[in-house]
A protein has these predicted regions:
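Receiver (REC) domain active-site loop signature in two-component systems and cognate sites
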Residues: 61
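Short amphipathic alpha-helix used as the core "switch/output" element in two-component signaling
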Residues: 45, 67-80
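Helix N-cap/capping motif at the beta->alpha junctions
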Residues: 36-45, 66
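Active-site beta3 strand of CheY-like receiver
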Residues: 50-56
Length: 135
């Protein structure tokens, strides 16, 4: 997995954005440009104006939720292939299914560890590499 990438972390809680950022650095994403947005609307504006390699988003946010952000990403031709990892306190089966149906690449329930984050990211990028090799 390439650890030199541009990641957008989306969460309305600044402490959670900082936790995700610190865990990414702990996992070796030291040459990575990590940017932050506090809701889905701001994230979508950023995604439309500059390229990113990964979005890590919360579900529950004001203005535009993470699931609505995911749906907007999948609806835009220029963004639809962007990997999205949902990091949320939502452990409801229906919401996990809704995220899968909307095209999420991975789902992590808070609280989580660096090991869990690494495993999810590894799986996401392994699947992307495998689908690219077969395309």
């Amino acid at each position: 997995m390439d650890k030199n990438m541009k990641i957008l972390v989306v969460d309305d809680f600044s402490t959670m954005r900082r936790i995700v950022r610190n865990l990414l650095v702990e996992l070796g994403f030291t040459n990575t440009l990590i940017q932050e947005a506090d809701d889905g609307n701001n994230a979508l504006t950023m995604l439309r104006s500059q390229p990113f390699d990964l979005v890590v988003t919360d579900w529950n946010m004001p203005n535009m939720t993470g699931i609505d952000l995911l749906r907007a990403i999948r609806a835009e031709p220029s963004l639809k292939g962007l990997p999205v990892l949902m990091v949320t306190a939502e452990n409801n089966r229906d919401q996990i299914i809704a995220a899968a149906q909307a095209g999420v690449n991975g789902y992590v329930v808070k609280p989580f560890t660096a090991v869990t984050l690494r495993e999810k990211l590894t799986k996401i990028f392994e699947r992307i590499a495998a689908s690219g090799a077969s395309a």
